[in-house]
C-alpha cells in the first residue's frame, strides 16, 4: 500500500507566483538560470541554482553555494515570498500542453515506501548526483522541488480532482520558455483529504516518472533524520517527500533521440547495407520522417531520411528490456555497427529530447557537427510500469516526459 499524507505547503502569494516559479534545477545550466532570473530577486533560481548569486564560473558544488541556498530560502520566507499554509492540504496541479491536460495530486509520499520498494524506480541513480541533492535538502531542511510520480488510474481520485478543477484556481499562468499552462488548486475539504489518503493506500505501487535523484536524496535524508532523532515517531515531516502524482494514462512521453558524430569509418552505402541485416530499410525522401510504430526507427543521413523496421523474430517480446526500442537501437545499431558501447560516456553520441523535434536532428547533421541522427518511437508508460514491476532498470536516455513540473508552486518543509 502507498502511504501519503497532506502537508502545510509553503507557497507564494497568488500575485507573486509568476515571479517565484521556475523550471526544475536539472533542465538548465547556470548561465541559463542566471539569464532567466535576471534582476528578479524573487526567482526560485536563487534557491535551486544559487550559484547565480556568485561570479560566473563558481562551481555549483561549492560549499558557499549550498549555504547561500539556505540563506535565500530563509529570506524568501522572511520577505513573505513563500508563506506556509495554516492547515494540512493536498493540492491539484494541472499542466496543459498542446491541448492535452494532465492532473496531478501533490502529496507527501512516505520515504519508507521508496526504501521498501512501494515507490518503484526505472532508472539508475549516480551517487554524486544523489549527494548534491542531499546537501541541498539538508541545508534547506525542505523539499524545495517535487518529484514526479505516476499511479494506476483511479475513478475516485479522478472525481476528487474534478470537483476542485471546476473552481477558480489558486494559480493560473502560462510559463515562459515552454509556453504551457500551469494551474493549481488547494484540496481543503476533510472528506476529500481522507478520500485521497485512503485511495492511495489501496495502491500496491507508485512509479517514479521523473526525478530519480531528487527522490533518492529526499528518502536518504529522511532516513538520516530518523536515525539521528532519539524521539523519532514516524509522523515527522521528514518521513515524507513532496511528490506530484499523475494517473499513468494521462502522461505524455516524447521520443528521446540520438545524434552521432561519425559512422565508424563506414561509407553511407556500407552503413545502410549493414543495417539491412536486422532491419527493412526504406528511403523516405528529404522531409523529416517520424517512426510510426514500435520497432520502427528513423535514420537521417546525408540529407535523406530512412525508415528502419526491425525484422520479425529477432527479439524476445516477453523480455521487458530486450524488447525496448532503446535496447534494440543500442545493441543492433550503436554497438554492433557504430562501436558505441556506453551511452553515458562515449563522446561520439549526444541526445535530443523530443520537444526539440526532428528539425533539431536535421539541423545538427546538416551543420556538419554530427554525421547521422536516429529517431525512436516513444516509450510507453505501460513499458515503464512493466520494467519497474519486474525489478529491472531502463537503459540510459530512454524517457523524456513533457511537460516538466514547474518549481516554486509549493514547498515541503521537513521540520
Question: Which residues make up each language-model segment?
Answer:
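Surface-exposed, charge/polar-rich loops and edge strands
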Residues: 1-415
Amino acid at each position: 500500500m502507498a502511504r501519503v499524507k497532506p502537508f502545510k505547503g509553503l507557497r507564494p502569494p497568488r500575485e507573486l507566483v509568476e515571479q517565484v516559479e521556475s523550471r526544475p534545477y536539472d533542465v538548465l545550466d547556470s548561465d541559463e538560470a542566471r539569464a532567466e532570473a535576471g534582476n528578479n530577486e524573487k526567482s526560485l533560481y536563487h534557491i535551486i541554482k544559487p550559484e547565480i548569486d556568485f561570479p560566473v564560473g563558481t562551481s555549483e558544488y561549492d560549499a558557499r553555494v549550498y549555504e547561500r541556498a539556505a540563506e535565500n530560502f530563509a529570506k524568501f520566507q522572511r520577505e513573505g515570498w513563500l508563506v506556509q499554509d495554516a492547515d494540512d492540504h493536498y493540492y491539484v496541479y494541472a499542466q496543459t500542453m498542446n491541448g492535452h491536460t494532465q492532473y496531478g495530486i501533490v502529496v507527501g509520499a512516505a520515504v519508507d515506501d521508496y526504501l521498501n520498494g512501494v515507490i518503484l524506480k526505472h532508472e539508475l541513480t549516480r551517487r554524486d548526483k544523489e549527494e548534491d541533492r542531499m546537501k541541498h535538502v539538508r541545508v534547506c531542511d525542505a523539499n524545495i522541488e517535487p518529484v514526479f510520480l505516476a499511479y494506476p488510474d483511479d475513478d475516485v481520485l479522478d472525481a476528487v480532482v474534478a470537483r476542485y478543477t471546476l473552481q477558480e484556481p489558486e494559480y493560473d499562468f502560462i510559463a515562459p520558455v515552454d509556453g504551457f499552462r500551469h494551474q493549481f488548486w488547494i484540496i481543503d475539504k476533510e472528506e476529500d483529504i481522507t478520500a485521497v489518503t485512503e485511495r492511495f493506500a489501496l495502491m500496491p505501487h507508485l512509479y517514479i516518472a521523473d526525478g530519480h535523484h531528487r527522490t533518492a536524496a529526499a528518502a536518504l535524508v529522511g532516513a538520516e533524520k530518523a536515525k539521528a532523532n532519539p524521539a523519532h515517531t514516524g509522523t515527522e515531516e521528514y518521513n515524507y517527500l513532496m511528490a506530484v502524482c499523475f494517473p499513468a494514462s494521462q502522461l505524455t512521453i516524447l521520443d528521446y533521440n540520438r545524434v552521432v558524430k561519425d559512422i565508424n569509418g563506414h561509407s553511407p552505402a556500407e552503413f545502410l547495407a549493414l543495417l539491412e541485416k536486422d532491419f527493412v530499410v526504406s528511403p523516405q525522401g528529404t522531409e523529416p520522417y517520424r517512426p510510426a510504430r514500435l520497432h520502427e526507427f528513423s535514420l537521417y543521413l546525408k540529407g535523406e531520411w530512412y525508415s528502419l523496421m526491425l525484422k520479425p523474430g529477432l527479439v524476445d517480446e516477453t523480455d521487458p528490456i530486450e524488447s525496448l526500442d532503446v535496447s534494440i537501437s543500442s545493441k543492433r545499431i550503436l554497438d554492433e555497427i557504430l562501436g558505441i558501447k556506453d551511452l553515458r560516456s562515449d563522446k561520439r553520441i549526444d541526445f535530443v529530447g523530443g520537444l526539440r523535434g526532428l528539425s533539431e536532428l536535421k539541423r545538427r547533421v546538416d551543420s556538419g557537427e554530427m554525421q547521422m541522427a536516429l529517431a525512436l518511437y516513444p516509450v510507453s508508460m505501460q513499458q515503464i510500469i512493466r520494467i519497474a514491476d519486474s525489478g529491472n532498470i531502463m537503459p540510459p536516455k530512454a524517457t523524456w516526459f513533457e511537460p516538466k513540473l514547474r518549481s516554486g508552486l509549493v514547498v515541503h518543509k521537513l521540520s
